[in-house]
Amino acid sequence: MTEVRRRGRPGQQEPSAQKGAQALERGIAILQYLEKSGGSSSVSDISLNLDLPLSTTFRLLKVLEGADFVYQDSQLGWWHIGLGAFNIGSAYIHNRDVLSVGGPFMRRLMLMSGETVNVAIRNGNEAVLIGQQECKSMVRMCAPLGSRLPLHASGAGKALLYPLPAEELVDVIVKTGLQRFTPTTIVDLPVLQRNLDEARACGYSIDQEEHVTGLNCIASAVYDDVGSVVAAISISGPASRLTPDRFVSQGELVRETARNISTALGLKPQAD
C-alpha cells in the first residue's frame, strides 16, 4: 500500500530536497567564511578552507552573485560580500545600532555643522553609505544610500581604515589598490599611511576633494562596546563652503559626535 505523506509532516526527504538543503548550507558557509575573512577571499581559498570542490564553489558563488549576495572584483578576481547581504542585515541595523542610537547625534551634528551628515560601514574593501541626515542649505552634497565609497579616497573610508592595525591596514590597501579619482587623490602608499597616522592622532580624517572634485568630507570612526570599529560618521559639503580653515573646528564636532555614539553603543570612555 502506497504511503500518503501529508504536506508539512516530517518524513524522509526526497533526494532533490536533500541536495537543495546541502546547497543552502554550503552557500551560507561561503558567506560566513567571507565575513570572517574581512569580507573578501579568492575562490581557491574558499574551496580549500570549506573543503569543497573548486567547481562546486564557483557554481555556488555564481548563484550568490545572481542574488547580489556576493560580487567579483574585476581586477583581482576576488569575491566580496555584496549589497544583497547588506540589505538583509539592514533590518538589524535599522532596529538596533548606529542608526537608531545615533539618530539624535546625527541631527545635532547636522545643525551645528550646517552640512549633510552620513554614516557608512565597511563592506569588504569598500565603504557603503547606510544613513544620512541632509542639511538645510540650498546647496548640499548628498549621495544616495547604498553608495559605495573607496576606502583610501573618502573621508568615511579613511575613518574606517585608520583604527586598523598596521599589517591589516596595508593588506586592505594592497587588495583595494590606490585608484586615482581626482588630482588630489592619494595614490602613494607611504603618503596615505602618513595621512592615516595624522587622522588617528587627531581623531578624524579629511577628504579634500580626493574622491569628487568640489566635495570635501570630514569623518571619524565609531566603535562598539568592545572597541571594534563598526561605522564612520562624516559631514560632507561643497569645497567652497567646507573650506580648509574650518577643518579643525568641524573635525572636532565630528569627533565628538563619533565619541558620543560610541559611548551610547556601550564603549567605555578612556581615562585621559
UniProtKB/Swiss-Prot annotation:
Ligand binding (glyoxylate): 154-156, 207, 217, 234-236
UniProt region (Disordered), positions on chain: 1-20
Purpose: Negative regulator of allantoin and glyoxylate utilization operons. Binds to the gcl promoter and to the allS-allA intergenic region.
HTH iclR-type domain span: 21-83
Source taxon at top rank: Bacteria
Biological processes, Gene Ontology terms: negative regulation of DNA-templated transcription
The IclR-ED domain, residue ranges: 98-267
Gene it is expressed from: allR
Organism: Klebsiella pneumoniae
A Pfam family matched in the record: IclR_C
Alphabetical UniProt keywords: DNA-binding, Repressor, Transcription, Transcription regulation
Family annotation (SUPFAM superfamilies): GAF domain-like, Winged helix' DNA-binding domain
Residue range(s) of DNA binding per entry: 43-62
Single annotated GO MF: DNA-binding transcription factor activity
Coiled-coil positions: none
Name of the molecule in the record: HTH-type transcriptional repressor AllR
